[in-house]
Amino acid sequence: MNISEGTVSVSRLVYLLKEVVEDNFVQVLVTGEIANFSAPSSGHYYFAVKDDQAQLRGVMFRSSNRLLKFTPENGMQVLCGGRVSLYPQRGELQLVVDRMEPLGVGSWQLAFEKLKTKLDAEGLFEVGRKRRLPSFPRTIGVVTSPTGAAIHDILNVLRRRGAGLHVLLSPVRVQGDGAADEIARAIADFNRHGQADVLIVGRGGGSPEDLWAFNEEVVARAVFASRIPVISAVGHEVDVTISDLVADLRAPTPSAAAELVVQGRQELERHVDHLVMRLSGQMQGRLSLLKERLDGLRRRLRSPVDDLRRQYRDLEQLRKRLFSAMEKTMQRAANRLGLAGSRLHALSPLATLDRGYAIVFSAKTSTIVRDARTLTPGDRVQIRFAKGSVEATVDEVDHGD
């Protein structure tokens, strides 16, 4: 047989089919019954999803199935979300599942996922557009049932923690036909009249059907359009609604929403309390220091006479030491002066005269005559003795040669 030029290999055909399938079934939601379920040691789940007329092999990798709140079982009706892939080695289609829910809430979940995908694509869930709550709101708008537990929980918290806050309730139905429209109108009315600084929109817990009004598109768009920051407080912590995703802030319960409203006020009060404690501590420390100084001054003022007596004794001791030093100094000076006088007297000419010697002065020049050859007969001289003097005339000169 002739091989046509238009033929393709098996692998080529399979990979062409793989591209077609994976490009066109990127995200699908499939309902069916679990069959042939297995969970090997790898941690991945392998199974088939079937109905009365067909079945599709499925896989849920460990990174996805660890988030499940239940374990799939054979015969369980489920809603699977994921993508369709083609396994080339066996030429088999398979559903790569990234999320799974029991089919008991499947129809609700399907609607939830469709709206969630739509609004997410429009940017209603973007974190960047969400606003901060006012730190010190004065008026709180509440959109909920006037008879439910939610409003009582909110009021109890605000009374206990938010002294001076005003609460405006817009009573609405929170479940059943028309509830979503009432909730959306209440949010719009608060914005139209500018009556509140922050809105709490929510209700107490219930079944998925009971909470469904907060998954309606009309409520989501009203929350998104609100110029007033919105806190969504629907059901319990495990319940997540479309309103939670759109709101500026999600609270797990209505009571928690009220706590968030007064959080800024509480933080300010804690900050003020901290400052007061610091100031009180500093004042106590300062007062203690001043008290110590005052006690010291009191102790010093308590015995001024003792201080004066002590100072007088010190002064008297200094005076005695000074006079003693002066006497010793004067005595040493007197001794040195007496010794010097004795030495001076021994060297004085008068001492020599006392021993019988005399000094001859020339009457003409008033100088001492040390050599007889300087005199001639007839010269007048003055002779000085130890006591007194005489004048004489030289009669004869003996040169003493």
Swiss-Prot record:
Pfam families according to UniProt: Exonuc_VII_L, tRNA_anti_2
EC code: 3.1.11.6
Keyword Cytoplasm belongs to the record: yes
Source organism superkingdom: Bacteria
Record has Hydrolase as a keyword: yes
Compartments in which it is found: Cytoplasm
GO annotation, cellular component aspect: cytoplasm; exodeoxyribonuclease VII complex
Location, primary (coarse class): cytoplasm
GO biological process, one term: DNA catabolic process
Catalytic activity: Exonucleolytic cleavage in either 5'- to 3'- or 3'- to 5'-direction to yield nucleoside 5'-phosphates
Keyword terms: Cytoplasm, Exonuclease, Hydrolase, Nuclease
Single GO MF annotation: nucleic acid binding
Function: Bidirectionally degrades single-stranded DNA into large acid-insoluble oligonucleotides, which are then degraded further into small acid-soluble oligonucleotides.
Family, similarity comment: Belongs to the XseA family.
NCBIfam families: xseA
Quaternary structure annotation from Swiss-Prot or TrEMBL: Heterooligomer composed of large and small subunits.
Name of protein: Exodeoxyribonuclease 7 large subunit
Gene name for this UniProt entry: xseA
